[in-house]
Amino acid sequence: IQYLGRDARDMKYLYNWNAPIIWSKHEPGTFYHAAQLVLRTRDNGVTWEEVSPDLTRDQDGLQGKGGGPYTNEAVGAENYGTISYLLESPHEAGVLITGSDDGLVRITKNGGESWENITPKGLKECLVNAVEVSPHNPSTIYIATTRYKFNDYTPAIYKSSDYGKSWTNISEGIPYGAFSRVVREDEEQKGLLY
């Protein structure tokens, strides 16, 4: 096999196919972009700075050549150990939450100076598809996860009411095989989820 490109472990930044980029609701001209860590610009993209360490599991054995064993497209997006979701709280400046494609959830409440692992206890390695903050309560967080890459099609949606200190699986009633892509709370009716 002839491989093209570099091993993921040799790249400075590892991006997901759908690498998150968001604009700040609290700070004009500020954008955040996620690789395996969070980058920030405060000048509309002219300069960027890292505002987090690696927020993934950083599994070296999974950061080799992408696309194998069939084809290596070497496009730089066939990486594992990336941030798949990035959210700024709509309520509070400096509060950012990330979800990774290897199952970790992290929060900063001080604009990236320090980060806390708030992954639900017992959550297996998975793809964190979505992270949402309740429009009614800044401490209420929802996450949608999936383990389809592990041939596990059990839907998994979680809720925290305390900034991720504790979590409850709220997936009851969602049938096996239903893909957990996103969860959102209605902006008008508290507790109504989509």
Q: Model-flagged regions — what are they?
A:
Residues 1-194:
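Beta-propeller blade termini and top-face loops
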